[in-house]
């Protein structure tokens, strides 16, 4: 089977998160000479395949087989791959069965490697992601099988194939501020404490503010207000409470404690509560590390392009590898149609991605 045939086969599985729809068992059979470990929990399947070629380092390719629901607006069946004008249309074409097909085919054809090659695949990245890669890595750590390096084949390229890799990701801090006032009649504002009026005074000082200056790899951490709600949708009652929700995509310079101090600076003296949670921690892989250097060279060899090192975008499963000290990068096809109707990627990109991964294995 060639990489494009494998790609089409994977696209035909209707693997809407967290259902792998049989795709993981298919991959296990396709790589039958690799040892297989299953880490399944709460309806989520995780497959770890590994093969020890030598006594050297452990390189893991990682990704997810689950996809988001297709939604409306498709011009073809989202789970029947359509080949047209050099593109393949299907849900998951970019995010991220192209990446999975490329590294599965690359490791299948590997004859020589100085250490251990492995694959970690999950059926829950697009959903809650609690029992996916995160859980599988917990089990691998317990078994002393954590890799030294990881390549997550998420779609990273922007304008053309090979133009960007991710060497890190911002974290995500979520917050809810509740300002407590005193409900009253709109005609007697002096007898009430209107939380909207109180909060309105500080909003210009908080909304969209940079919490740090960023650096050469990360944009500044920005305080982004996502929702404000208060009152009963009437015109003659001032509310007794106001709730404001926000998000900070933080770099390595800003912590949850920094966000707490920032909020307190403006809400000090008000009657308020603050709830904070961190759904993802920021990480950065050293640009001089082996995995970054090897992927850079492989991309340059196969495309003639030197990729930029990016940390932009949302979160991914790469963050879970980083938490275990795994030197992790992300590289895949372009990402201009992810989660959209008529998602597509070009056959040429998939073939080039497969060749890049083959070169990584050869030269690592």
Swiss-Prot record:
Metabolic or biological pathway: Amino-acid biosynthesis; L-lysine biosynthesis via DAP pathway; LL-2,6-diaminopimelate from (S)-tetrahydrodipicolinate (succinylase route): step 3/3
One Pfam match: Peptidase_M20
GO BP field: diaminopimelate biosynthetic process; L-arginine biosynthetic process; lysine biosynthetic process via diaminopimelate
Residues annotated for Zn(2+) 1 binding in this entry: 64, 95, 154
Keyword Zinc-finger: no
UniProt keyword annotations, A-Z: Amino-acid biosynthesis, Cobalt, Diaminopimelate biosynthesis, Hydrolase, Lysine biosynthesis, Metal-binding, Zinc
Entry function: Catalyzes the hydrolysis of N-succinyl-L,L-diaminopimelic acid (SDAP), forming succinate and LL-2,6-diaminopimelate (DAP), an intermediate involved in the bacterial biosynthesis of lysine and meso-diaminopimelic acid, an essential component of bacterial cell walls.
Name of the protein: Succinyl-diaminopimelate desuccinylase
Species per Swiss-Prot/TrEMBL record: Nitratiruptor sp. (strain SB155-2)
Lineage of source species: Bacteria, Pseudomonadati, Campylobacterota, Epsilonproteobacteria, Nautiliales
Gene: dapE
């Amino acid at each position: 089977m060639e990489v494009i045939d494998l790609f089409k086969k994977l696209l035909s599985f209707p693997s809407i998160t967290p259902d792998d729809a049989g795709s993981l068992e298919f991959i296990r059979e396709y790589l039958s000479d690799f040892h297989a470990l299953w880490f399944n929990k709460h309806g989520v399947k995780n497959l770890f395949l590994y093969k020890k070629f030598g006594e050297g380092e452990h390189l893991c390719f990682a990704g997810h087989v689950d996809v988001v629901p297709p939604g409306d607006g498709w011009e073809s069946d989202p789970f029947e791959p359509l080949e047209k004008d050099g593109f393949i249309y299907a849900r998951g074409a970019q995010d991220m069965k192209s990446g999975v097909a490329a590294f599965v085919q690359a490791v299948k054809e590997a004859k020589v490697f100085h250490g251990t090659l492995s694959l970690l695949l999950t059926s829950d990245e697009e959903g809650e992601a609690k029992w996916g890669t995160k859980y599988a890595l917990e089990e691998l750590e317990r078994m002393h099988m954590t890799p030294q390096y990881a390549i997550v084949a998420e779609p990273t390229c922007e304008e053309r194939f090979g133009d960007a890799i991710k060497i890190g990701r911002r974290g995500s801090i979520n917050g809810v501020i509740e300002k407590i006032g005193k409900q009253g009649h709109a005609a007697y504002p002096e007898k009430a404490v209107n939380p909207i009026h109180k909060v309105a005074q500080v909003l210009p000082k908080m909304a969209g503010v940079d919490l740090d200056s960023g650096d050469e790899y990360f944009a500044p951490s920005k305080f982004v207000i996502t929702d404000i709600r208060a009152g009963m949708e009437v015109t003659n009652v001032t509310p007794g409470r106001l709730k404001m929700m926000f998000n900070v995509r933080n770099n390595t310079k800003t912590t949850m404690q920094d966000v707490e101090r920032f909020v307190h600076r403006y809400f000090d003296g008000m009657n308020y509560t603050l709830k904070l949670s961190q759904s993802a921690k920021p990480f950065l892989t050293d640009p001089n590390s082996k995995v970054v250097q090897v992927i850079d060279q492989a991309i340059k060899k196969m495309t003639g392009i030197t990729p930029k090192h990016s940390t932009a975008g949302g979160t991914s499963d790469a963050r879970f590898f980083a938490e275990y000290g795994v030197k992790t990068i992300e590289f895949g096809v372009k990402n201009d149609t992810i989660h959209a109707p008529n998602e597509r990627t070009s056959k040429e990109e998939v073939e080039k991605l497969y060749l890049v991964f083959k070169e990584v294995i050869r030269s690592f």
